[in-house]
């Protein structure tokens, strides 16, 4: 469709909005050339999904539940799920969202958002599941996850965050599953971690690449701080890795950091 702008407003009973489709359907490339999207006064909307190649030419996305902002005004007070299917918003360069107080699930598909340079998740009090597909967010230099009190699952697919230099995983008290695929974060130079109570971390799956990068950072002169909250207190904060510090960590968390 050649439409350059799309506005959906004043639909009080709309609960699910799916624009485009996944790879198994025929109506892909929806609003491929659309550069402006307006979603206003959709008070009942709970699920927002963008399909394959949807909004391919859009360069900025602002999801703010209580504000009209930029070229993507959004008023979605009850939104609980956001999904970007494969290759949707592939030209996106700027991503901002806030006030999404009910969102529990965010899914970013394969090859999405490869031009975005910064990504932050810090205003999602109900977020429980955050997943990234393969080959996505490859140009993100700074990745921040902060103050996500309900986040339980983080999943990152192969070859994603290829150019990421700095990461913050801070104040994530209930994370229980942390999965990192192959060749993820190969460029990391600084990691700041505080992934919650160790007893809650029941499943940690990381690739050899990520383990190697973490080990190199720990043993180099880079400014590296690993924070770990255990029994309600900070267990350790060290500039460089040491065998003693490694042994002091609970087993599940050790596997997240070293081969």
What are the language-model segments listed below?
Residues 23, 64, 78, 85, ...:
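Intrinsically disordered, low-complexity polyampholyte segments enriched for Lys and acidic residues
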Residues 1, 9-12, 32, 40-43, ...:
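Inter-repeat linker/turn residues at the boundaries of leucine-rich repeats
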Residues 6, 17, 37-40, 48, ...:
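Conserved hydrophobic beta-strand positions in leucine-rich repeat
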Residues 219-233, 237-257:
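Low-complexity basic/metal-binding stretches
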Residues 20, 51, 64, 85-88, ...:
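Periodic glycine anchor positions in long extracellular repeat architectures
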Residues 20-28:
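Acidic/polar low-complexity surface segments
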Residues 26, 85-86, 105:
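N-linked glycosylation sites
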Residues 3, 14, 25, 34, ...:
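Conserved hydrophobic position(s) of the canonical leucine-rich repeat
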